[in-house]
């Protein structure tokens, strides 16, 4: 696994989130998962960070991408070469 600062805000039932998780796994990137569906406080935290509550959303250091699986995957490919 490649050590990263990636935090993925997601829900297990979300197909768009599954797509991002699959990409992260395929690229062997280590990441932290925050399941917003299980913790209402995390949904509030998501709104404070991104201004929206849509998932998947991701933070990687200074980079924040909200509610867009295609943009997250494009970023991962560019930043981590995959």
Label for each model-derived stretch:
Residues 78-82:
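Generic C-terminal helix-cap and adjacent flexible tail
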Residues 39-41, 45, 57-58:
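BRCT (BRCA1 C-terminal) domain core and associated BRCT-interaction motifs
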Residues 15-18, 41, 67:
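Residues that form or flank phosphate/diphosphate-binding pockets in enzymes
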Residues 10, 30-42:
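Thiol-based oxidoreductase modules, predominantly thioredoxin-like and allied folds used
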Residues 1-29:
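Local sequence-structure signature of Cys/Sec-based thiol-disulfide redox active-site neighborhoods
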Residues 47-54:
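Thiol/disulfide oxidoreductase modules built on the thioredoxin-like
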Residues 54-65:
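A short, hydrophobic beta-strand/beta-hairpin element that forms part of a small beta-sheet core
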Residues 63-67, 72-76:
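C-terminal cap of thioredoxin/glutaredoxin-like
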């Amino acid at each position: 696994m490649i050590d990263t600062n990636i935090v993925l805000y997601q829900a297990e039932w979300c197909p768009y989130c599954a797509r991002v998780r699959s990409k992260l796994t395929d690229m062997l990137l280590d990441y932290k998962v925050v399941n917003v569906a299980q913790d209402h406080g995390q949904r509030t935290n998501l709104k404070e960070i991104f201004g929206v509550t849509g998932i998947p959303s991701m933070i990687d250091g200074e980079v924040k991408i909200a509610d867009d699986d295609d943009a997250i995957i494009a970023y991962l490919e560019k930043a981590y070469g995959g």
